[in-house]
Amino acid sequence: FVGAALKVLANVLPPVISWIKQ
């Protein structure tokens, strides 16, 4: 479960971070 959660976070975080930095 932890591995899947980290995989999802790895896929979701970059767009969110780039959006916040705009």
Swiss-Prot record:
InterPro entries: Melittin/Api_allergen. GO terms for molecular function: protein kinase inhibitor activity. It comes from the Eukaryota. Keywords: Amidation, Amphibian defense peptide, Secreted. GO terms for cellular component: extracellular region. It is found in: Secreted. The modification Glutamine amide is found at Q22. Expressed by the skin glands. One of its GO terms (biological process) is defense response. This is Melittin-related peptide FQ-22-1. It comes from Rana arvalis.
